[in-house]
Amino acid sequence: MAKIVKFGDEARQKMLAGVNVLADAVKTTLGPKGRNVVLDKSFGAPTVTKDGVSVAKEIELEDKFENMGAQMVKEVASKASDDAGDGTTTATVLAQAIVNEGLKSVAAGMNPMDLKRGIDKAVNAAVAHIKSIAQPCEDGKSIAQVGTISANSDSHVGDIIAEAMAKVGKEGVITVEEGSGLENELDVVEGMQFDRGYLSPYFINNQESMSVEIEQPYILLVDKKISNIRELLPVLEAVAKSGKPLVIVAEDVEGEALATLVVNNMRGIVKVTACKAPGFGDRRKAMLQDIAILTGGTVISEEVGLDLESATLEHLGSAKRVTMTKENSTIVDGAGVAADIESRVAQIRAQIEETSSDYDREKLQERVAKLAGGVAVIKVGAMTEVEMKEKKARVEDALHATRAAVEEGVVPGGGTALIRAAAAIADLKGDNEDQNAGIGIAIRALEAPLRQIVSNAGGEASVVADKVKNGEGNFGFNAASGEYGDMLEFGILDPAKVSRTAIQAAGSIAGLMITTEAMIADKPSEGGAAAPDMGGMGGMGGMGGMM
């Protein structure tokens, strides 16, 4: 396949054109008065969004060189989204500002490598300043404010996320699903829930909800299949004497053993129910151990020299309540020792740090949540499917932002923190004039998000930027109301992690673009789609639309 190669200024101008097309589309969504972007979908209604990364993902340009520029900026948005969950539009605006100024300086004859070194110095100094001014975000009010700002000033979203975090703790799992109503709903599962239900409908004792509800049970955990009732008899007799109910969690309970348990339960000899252990293979062993630690029991496993016949009441865990439906089982208020649970959580966290697989990380985080907190589900409600998708994306963004805020703290929002970072590094010096120019480019670029927020709100960007620059600390501009004042008092907060990631991602990609000297792309085929028909096979022309 023949290639086209472009060099120097010609290559950079093409790349810049692509950067500007993508960034101009994305930056219209920035701020409380950001505009909507409508995305065409090949099936169904178009999607309306104010989410920067959704807009960026849609853009593919026809010119291959321009498209390379656009894709590199798209990478900035994706990086910000992956690392912090938000700040995609801010990162794109910063990258565009640095690239535009940087390429002008390269065209004026400055050394691209020194410009990049200067930009990197300024980025590192700005990130250090952001970290230094971050304030912890721990109370429900500030969590709600961060969620509200990230969900495009929708206070209902901020409040529901704060409520979810209050109920399941900072470590709890919060998931977002499409609801069936018109309003957002919060559904909280206390305790440990796993996706295995009762093994026989004959265990059901609540006919209304078709579930098994057992109070203050003993819990027997077995890492094997139970098919012979003789193995179970010693434990069953001991439990029957104690007068408490029994919950069995095993790899499986089948045949004679299951039939005997059902008969005992129905006759009221011993109140018992059984379910399969969650997970498979090594993950099942680990999750059984989690349940053991949560309930203060021991897993009966031949690997550790314990068999079912020698099990006693000391080996059994207990809990305040166990509920089982056809699909799920929930253990509430296990009797485990708090210190043991904490050390187990710390152990799983260490595994999260080490794993390179996203799937494993997600499963490990779920285990932490089940041990440490609980699980909350936010069900997003809307009138139409288009609105539902847009709203769900906003709630997910807001959730990521609040997690980032809890992790690294918050800074004044609305572009104010970046203006303060620019002022803090104004005296930074490089090793030569070209590096100083690079530092200057990055400092000026830090004003771009505030200017864009103001112009999206219909204000005069230069006037507002000067006024905010002349202020101190948290003094900034509230674009939603058009007022100046303390951003923290207005409740306009950005997670420090989001601001930091946006600066780093933008600086990194912009540095690469400024130092680009050649671009290579496939040569387009002659005539493209309008090639002459293939003799007698002219009828195949219509197949183009089928691809």
Swiss-Prot record:
Residues the record lists as binding ATP: 29-32, 50, 86-90, 414, 478-480, 494
UniProt subcellular location: Cytoplasm
Catalytic activity, EC: 5.6.1.7
PROSITE patterns reported for this sequence: CHAPERONINS_CPN60
Keywords: ATP-binding, Chaperone, Cytoplasm, Isomerase, Nucleotide-binding
UniProt GO MF annotations: ATP binding; ATP-dependent protein folding chaperone; isomerase activity; unfolded protein binding
Family matches, as InterPro entries: Chaperonin_Cpn60_CS, Cpn60/GroEL, Cpn60/GroEL/TCP-1, GroEL-like_apical_dom_sf, GROEL-like_equatorial_sf, TCP-1-like_intermed_sf
GO biological process per UniProt: protein refolding
Main location: cytoplasm
TM helices/strands, residue ranges: none
Entry-linked SUPFAM superfamilies: GroEL apical domain-like, GroEL equatorial domain-like, GroEL-intermediate domain like
Source organism, top-level taxon: Bacteria
Cellular component annotations (GO), alphabetically ordered: cytoplasm
Calcium found in the keyword field: no
Catalytic activity: ATP + H2O + a folded polypeptide = ADP + phosphate + an unfolded polypeptide
Function field: Together with its co-chaperonin GroES, plays an essential role in assisting protein folding. The GroEL-GroES system forms a nano-cage that allows encapsulation of the non-native substrate proteins and provides a physical environment optimized to promote and accelerate protein folding.
Family statement: Belongs to the chaperonin (HSP60) family.
HAMAP family in the cross-refs: CH60
NCBIfam families noted in UniProt: GroEL, PRK00013.1, PRK12849.1, PRK12850.1, PRK12851.1
Subunit details: Forms a cylinder of 14 subunits composed of two heptameric rings stacked back-to-back. Interacts with the co-chaperonin GroES.
This protein's name: Chaperonin GroEL
